[in-house]
């Protein structure tokens, strides 16, 4: 078992380990127990009732966090011609095709998200082994393969503004950063509810029994706080209505 420092242990003493917290209480407590001297990421960890070995039980989707992630998102767009011009005007950080493919093959990965125009996927597809394992590969399911150039500014704006992809890991848990410690409680709650609502909507058809088993929130360095799942799902549904 890893040894924790004094501040971590003191933070843990403020949490009732057997209690399931309502969202408002959890967010308030979370800010109180975050002790690091940097702007920690606020994390949510959702344990799902799925068998990740089964293809029809995979959870993979996106959510637009209404208050963003708290970090600057560098977006790369694989586009040429008119789409290249539109991407640059819409605020893409890197735009091109052949030159970017070559740079990525050489090990360059200084971006946080990637979009590809559909007509460039023939060239981009070969990057799957490099980008796929890092969650950077453009994908139709996540909306990052664009067919109509008129849709490009909207997709780019969503990524810049807080659109993030989530997926289950090999143990059936989804991990997502939903903001920073410097966010207000309303902002953290808003992002939490948006994620939980998106997670509910992403329930796979093959999932049986209880889908959302546990929800835990924490900051980068803090202990976790266990949420009351039914109360959180209900609050997320009300917020989305």
Regions found by a protein language model. Give the residues of each.
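Translation machinery proteins
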Residues: 21-85, 112
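Feature captures the catalytic cores and cofactor-binding loops of soluble hydro-lyases/lyases
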Residues: 84-88, 102
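Conserved active-site and cofactor/substrate-binding residues in soluble primary-metabolism enzymes
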Residues: 6, 18-21, 25, 36-39, ...
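C-terminal alpha-helical interaction appendages
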Residues: 1-19, 32, 38, 43
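Positively charged, low-complexity, intrinsically disordered RNA-binding extensions
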Residues: 10, 15, 22, 154-241
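Short glycine-enriched loop/turn motifs at secondary-structure junctions
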Residues: 9-13, 67-73, 88-90, 108
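Residue-level signature of catalytic and energy-coupling elements of molecular machines
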Residues: 26, 87, 132, 217
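Long, charge-patterned amphipathic alpha-helical coiled-coil/hairpin "stalk" segments used as oligomerization
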Residues: 92-202
């Amino acid at each position: 078992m890893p040894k924790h420092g004094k501040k971590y242990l003191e933070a843990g003493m403020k949490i009732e380990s057997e209690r399931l917290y309502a969202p408002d209480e959890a967010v308030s407590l979370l800010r109180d127990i975050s002790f690091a001297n940097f702007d920690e990421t606020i994390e949510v960890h959702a344990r799902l009732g799925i068998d990740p070995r089964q293809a029809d039980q995979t959870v993979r989707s996106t959510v637009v966090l209404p208050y963003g992630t708290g970090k600057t998102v560098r977006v790369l767009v694989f586009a040429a011609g008119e789409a290249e011009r539109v991407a640059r005007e819409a605020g893409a950080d890197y735009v091109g095709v052949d030159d970017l493919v070559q740079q990525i093959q050489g090990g360059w990965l200084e971006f946080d998200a990637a979009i590809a125009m559909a007509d460039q996927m023939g060239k981009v597809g070969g990057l799957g082994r490099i980008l796929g394992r890092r969650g950077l590969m453009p994908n139709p399911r996540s909306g990052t393969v664009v067919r109509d150039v008129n849709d490009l500014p909207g997709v780019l704006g969503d990524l810049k503004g807080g659109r993030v992809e989530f997926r289950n890991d090999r143990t059936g848990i989804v991990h997502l950063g939903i903001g920073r410690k410097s966010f207000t409680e309303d902002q953290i709650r808003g992002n939490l509810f948006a994620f939980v609502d998106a997670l509910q909507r992403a329930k796979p058809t093959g999932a049986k029994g209880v889908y959302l088993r546990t929800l835990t929130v924490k900051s980068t360095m803090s202990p976790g706080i266990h949420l009351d799942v039914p109360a959180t799902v209900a609050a997320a549904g009300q917020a989305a209505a």
